[in-house]
């Protein structure tokens, strides 16, 4: 099962896996833990078990480019990780200082591909392809 959250966007179908930026001087592994804590409230019972080998990129549709990120970017380059969470659902708290999600759920890859915004489908398909082919 994979954690996904429904964003506080006008588009009620805006579900996604947690993600975020890498601060200056921060490693991707440190950034993923910081973002996970900020977006899910998870503080313990987790472990990074895989770092994707590829940096993934997606482009925003042209109608969103001016609305998001003040028009400064056309998309995002991302590094993805698999994190094992062995805690309880009660350890998850999306009502953080700056909440990004209004709802969350555990989901399957197929269901996630149905729920996310269409412009991220190719990205998520590529990520799932890589993690489904991990040896061991």
Protein language model regions, located:
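Sequence-pattern detector for short linear motifs
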Residues: 10, 37, 123-124
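A periodicity- and composition-biased signal for non-globular, repetitive helical segments
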Residues: 13, 25, 126-127
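Unchanged
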Residues: 23-118
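Charged phosphate-binding loop/patch that engages nucleotide di/tri-phosphates or the phosphate backbone
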Residues: 109-136
